[in-house]
A protein has these predicted regions:
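Active-site clefts of carbohydrate-active enzymes
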Residues: 1-11
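Carbohydrate-interacting/catalytic domains
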Residues: 11-20, 25-35, 39-173
């Protein structure tokens, strides 16, 4: 038992970073999404029927940032059919790299239809920044960065990721 935040390992900064990562991972992975009774702003206490939610936590930047992240995850989920249209079909998901255990970075693609542009997801499960980390995107050119859980607006330490990245036309994975 306990709130999602208290289940996260590490110090205060790591707890919030890990929870942001968990929520982004959950929203980007196939399957239906569920948060319960205030978990979108990372309360310290678990919900209880005998008291109100800890709304006052939204006065504090880390909790307000978490709420903003969940708002953005919901917006992306609604606006990008690749993130929800084929939740129950294997064709809606393809790993780019599930084997980088040394750096704890995993990447995958989500698809709405075979010929549609996919949504690429890269997750870093460590507190170590990975500048210049390369993943094998399926098409060369500019890709828009839609979300970075370490962005300062979500309570992360930044630096904020550039708005676009460029994929080169050379095999990687």
């Amino acid at each position: 038992k306990g709130s999602m935040l208290t289940k996260m390992p590490g110090d205060l900064w790591q707890k919030f970073a890990n929870l942001r990562l968990l929520y982004a991972y959950m929203w980007a992975h196939p399957g239906k999404k569920l948060l319960f009774m205030g978990q979108e702003w990372a309360p310290w206490r678990e919900w209880g029927e005998g008291r109100e939610l800890d709304w006052w936590l939204l006065q504090h930047a880390p909790h307000k940032g978490m709420q903003g992240l969940v708002r953005e995850l919901n917006r992306l989920h609604r606006s990008l059919p690749a993130l929800h249209a084929r939740d129950c079909e294997p064709e809606g998901f393809r790993w780019i790299d599930a084997d980088d255990a040394e750096r704890s970075v995993f990447s995958w693609l989500r698809f709405r239809a075979k010929d549609d542009a996919p949504v690429a997801v890269a997750t870093n499960f460590t507190p170590v920044a990975r500048p210049g980390y390369r993943i094998g995107l399926p098409k060369a050119g500019r890709w828009q960065v839609l979300l970075d859980t370490s962005a300062t607006r979500y309570g992360g330490s930044g630096p904020d990721t550039p708005a676009t990245v460029t994929a080169e036309s050379r095999p990687l994975h």
